Amino acid sequence: MVGILTGIKNRFLYNKLRKSLVGLTPYLAFDNTKEALQYYEEVFGACNITRTSPHSDLAESFGIDEAILSEKTVHSQFNILGKTLMAADNFQNEKTSCAECPVLLDLQGEEGREIEQAQEFWNKLVASNKVIVHAPFEKQFGGGRLGYFTDHYGVSWLLHVHP
């Protein structure tokens, strides 16, 4: 994945790839989304967080004890670096892996502010000691900067700024 993004030298192809991703929103599944949202708010600076618990009529169909409905999440939405993500509890109790399909936080660096914002975000992540860094956020041979890390929940992330 890293090679794909850093190897794109042709600006036309890069812009075409970016446009094809418009409208795609990562939808993550967790055992405890309420807890995960708190983590993303604390460590990633997530904002505009909304969370919906299931109604009592859904409790039976999801196999949830009505006493803990307020702890469960059927839908949530939040922003990280201006990018929208969604999440819900994994009601099927199936093992899921977010490691094989990284979430890309892709920022344009035309104004320079995006590079500063991404660097501040990266520094905060690393200082938290609550992520595992696989590749530092640094300049790439094809331009821009890229960093790769995994969070507490096993979600892999790419932070990319293209000049």
Residue spans for each PLM region:
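Short, solvent-exposed beta-strand edge segments and adjacent coil->beta transition regions
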Residues: 21-25, 98-104
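Vicinal oxygen chelate
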Residues: 4-19, 50-51, 71, 79, ...
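Core segments of cupin and vicinal oxygen chelate
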Residues: 20, 28-83
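Conserved hydrophobic beta-strand within the GNAT/NAT acetyltransferase core sheet
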Residues: 24-28, 135
